[in-house]
Amino acid sequence: MKKSIVTVVILVYALTAAQAQEQILKPYGIKSAIIEYTYSGDKTGTGTLYFDDYGMKSALYMETIMEGEESKGWVVAFGDYQSMWDPDQPDDGMKMKNPLLSWINEASNGDYESFTEEAYKKMGMFKSGKETLLGKECDVIKGDMGKVLVWNGIMMMMELKMGGYSSGQKATSIKTNVAVEPKYFIIPKNITFSEMPGF
C-alpha cells in the first residue's frame, strides 16, 4: 500500500509539473522558485523544493517521520534522470528515467491542455474551480483520492487518501523568480545508483 501511494504522489508531482504554459512547454510557468512545504497524515515533516530553468532542473529535500522512523532524502531531476538518495546513507541511491521529459514531448505533439486533463482523468481527478493559497490563485483538482491545488504547474497543496493511508502536503512559503544556487542540482559522485523502472 505504501508503494502504491508513493507511486501516486510521484505521478501527481509529474502531472502538476506538466501543466506548464503552452508557449514554452516547460514543467513550470515561472523560471525559478524556492518553496517550503509541510507534510501531514501518515508522514509528517518538512520539505524544500528548489527549481530553475522553468523546472527543467529541480531538487526536493525532505526531513520526515513515518511510523516512528525519521528519514532524510533528496530527489533531484536534471536531464534524463531523476535521482534519489539519503544523505545519511550516501553509499547507494536510486534513479529512474525522468517521467516529465517523455510526457512533455508527448504533449508538445498534440493538444497540450487536453493531454493534461486526460492524464488526470486516468487518476479519477478533475478540475474543479479555483482556490487561493499564499496569495496565488490555484487550480483545484479533485477526485475520489483527494484534492490538489496547482499554480503555474506547481503543486501548492495536496491531500490524498488510499485505503487506510493518508498523505498531505502544503506550501508554507514561496519565493518566485529568485536565484537558485547550482549546487542543489549536483548529483554526488560517490553514490552508486540502482536504476528503477519508470512509468
PLM feature spans:
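Positively charged n-region of N-terminal signal peptides that target proteins for export
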Residues: 1-4, 19
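Sec-dependent N-terminal signal peptides
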Residues: 4-15
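Bacterial Sec-dependent signal peptides at the C-terminal "C-region" and cleavage site
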Residues: 16-22
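Extended soluble regions of mature proteins
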Residues: 22-199
